[in-house]
Amino acid sequence: NYLILGLGDVYLTAPCAVPVDPRHRLLSSKYNPARTFTAEGTVGIGGMYMCIYGMDSPGGYQLIGRTLPIWNKFKKNKQFGDKQWFLQFFDQIKYFEVSEEELNQWRADFENGRAEIKIEETEFDYADYVQFLDDEAESIAEFKVKQQQAFTTEVDRWKEEFAAQPEEQI
C-alpha cells in the first residue's frame, strides 16, 4: 500500500506517495536528462516516491507501470464527485496486476464514465503504525542497509560508465 503524502508532484494533482511498509520502499534516481514524453497514467518511482503522471508530459521518474487516469478531464467518472482529481492526501493506493488488454479496457471504460474503481474506507492508526515500526525495527534497519549498499553500487557503476565515455559523447 502506498500512502499519499502530497499532491501535484508532477502535474494535475499527481500523487507523491511512499509504501507504508519501509521494507517495500524502492530507491531510484531520476533520469538525467529527463524524457521529453511520458504517457498519462504512467506510474514512476523517483527517489523513494511513487508518482502517477496525470497527463502526457516530460518526466524523469523510473517507469514501473501504467494505471487508470487520476485526472477526470471530461468529468464523466462519477467516483470523482464534483472534482476533476481523484486522490486526496493520506489516501492509500494498492495496485494489482492486469494484462495490457484488461488495462486498455479499464482505461476506455474510465474515459466513458463506466469504470468502477474499488474504494475501501480505512483508518490509518498512527499509534498502531508506530508499534509496527517498533516491532519490525530490526528487519527495517537490515533492509535499509542493503538498500543503501545497492544504490551506492549502482551510482558507482554509473560514474564508471560516464568516466569511460569519449569526451565528445558527454
Specify the residue positions occupied by each region the protein language model found.
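Glycine-rich active-site loops that engage anionic ligands at enzyme catalytic sites
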Residues: N1-I170
